[in-house]
Amino acid sequence: MRATPLRGPSNFAAPLHSEMAEASMPLTTLKAFMKMEAAGGIVLIAASAMALVLSNSPALTYYEALLETPVAIVVGPLSLHKPLLLWINDGLMAVFFLLVGLEIKREFLGGHLSDMRSALLPAMAAVGGMVVPALIYVGINWGQGPLLNGWAIPAATDIAFALGILALLGSRAPLALKVLLTAVAVIDDLGAIVIIALFYTAELSVASLVLAGAALAGLVALNLFGVRRLAPYAVLGLVLWVCVLKSGVHATLAGVAVALTIPYKPDTAGRSPLKELEHDLHKWVAFGVLPIFGFANAGVSFAGMTPASVLEPVTLGIALGLFIGKQIGVFGAAWLTVRFGLARMPEGVSWAQIYAMSLLCGIGFTMSLFIGSLAFENLPPDQAFDAPVRLGVLIGSVTSATIGYMILRFLPRRWSPKPRSSGS
């Protein structure tokens, strides 16, 4: 009778390696998904869709109770008490605006906005894309008193969503178009920051502003003295955020202020603190901050709504501002800028593609919802406009995204521009 040979280490290793490989497959798949350009937008859509489902189901009371859950941070005699929704809007969104500030600084110092002539086309397009939607909203809500506070809601662009749509299109969206959209959205974000600072600031606390100024001076000093470690910036940034929160100025602006003090220039090893922080924050914002914000703010209950609800001044002003205003403002300003010789068309981009891009700029979503949460926050409960704001943002953003995507997806190849000759 022949003895069965014992299994050596290599014999055991094969099935063990196979089991480990199978166990790691979900993690590998998750990592591959997170590397997709459109992944952040997909997660944001899923979180927002979940909010809509919960808001129109028996779970609505639990959803609302979750957002109203009181959360407190107490350090000695100092304490901050807020419902969970405000921690998300004031706290997590400060991290988002920190990332926005880093992107703005990088683009102006060493990116596509560092050259004045290159920056002029996206700058003019962004300004047009803010002014025209605001005018449409004001025109629809003229004479409506407090409703005019929402004029800036359709002026915003959600860069994460817009770039996510372009990423889904692959080669049908040329790199130059992505660069142009990014530049327009960055300048649009800068405009939104200015609008929040100037028009959506409550009564000011002088003492808190003085302390915030001292914290900001400390951050500037760190930069001037060449401090490149991020820990000191984080500590002073947290102090600045608390002071700004207590001052009456919206706390998210603290994130922008911190970003502008982070060193950009690389060291002898070629490492830039700003670029490293931007890289580290990107996934946290794309897969954490924005989906949580979308989940907390996109819930719209359709109970009691009728077709006439769409025609309410706030809803109609936002929806038309995003869908009609953005495409007129962005495309019109871009066309005039090129027509008068102030800037050149980007290499390899057609007017049809720029028109589609102007539609994608009408995806206001997270930024529009955020400004909407500020525009009417001081009104009494019986005059709340949360539902009309959310409905208008959803209608305008979804319509803009759908039509912009369809144009780029089915644009005939013959409409694509021919490469410029070297002599032109």
Annotate each predicted stretch with a short phrase.
Residues L86-F97, G145-A160, T201-A214, H250-A257, ...:
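Structural signature of hydrophobic alpha-helical transmembrane segments
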Residues P77, H81-G110, L260-I262, V285-M305, ...:
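Hydrophobic transmembrane alpha-helices of secondary-active transporters
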Residues V43-N56, F96-L102, V132-Y137, A215-A221, ...:
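Hydrophobic core segments of alpha-helical transmembrane domains in multi-pass membrane transport
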Residues L166-P263:
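Functional cores that coordinate and move charged inorganic groups
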